[in-house]
Regions:
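Hydrophobic pocket/interface hotspot
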Residues: 19, 31-32, 52, 56, ...
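Surface-exposed, charged secondary-structure patches
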Residues: 4, 11-14, 42, 46, ...
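Structural motif
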Residues: 37, 80-81, 109
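Short, low-complexity N-terminal intrinsically disordered segments enriched in polar/charged residues
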Residues: 1-37, 49, 125-127
Length: 127
């Protein structure tokens, strides 16, 4: 197995940038489309545990104004083979001292890369 193949890392880097742009713009069609369209996809958030794409899409649609603005402090990307990648982001919400973390597991399907599992948390229990 090839770990951290440069071409796969480049693809995942582009996806990470696209995701961050969509998140900050509250571009729901793009965000929803980046997740695996399955009842088996999982997103564990700061105040919610979401199972299945319908739950994830409903959460995003009901969130007024989308995700709070943030800046990325650090990002790491790893790939395992050509069809599995992990993106971890350390972020800080604008105007807040608390540090947040985001982890995404990406799998390449026939239709392209999709997030199959995601986790978002804040350090220190703050919101």
């Amino acid at each position: 197995m090839t770990v951290n193949d440069p071409s796969v890392i480049a693809e995942l880097s582009e996806l990470a940038e696209r995701y961050e742009t969509a998140l900050m713009a509250n571009d729901l069609p793009t965000l929803d489309g980046m997740f695996w369209q399955s009842p088996h996809v999982v997103r564990l958030g700061i105040g919610e545990n979401l199972y299945g794409i319908e739950s994830i899409a409903a959460f995003r649609a009901a969130r007024p104004g989308g995700s709070p603005p943030r800046r990325v402090l650090r990002m790491t990307i790893s790939s395992f083979g050509h069809d599995l990648g992990v993106i971890n982001v350390e972020f800080q919400r604008i105007g807040a001292a608390v540090i947040g973390r985001q982890s995404q597991s990406w799998v390449r399907f026939a239709e392209g890369w999709r997030i199959v599992a995601a986790h978002v948390s804040l350090m220190g229990g703050g919101h």
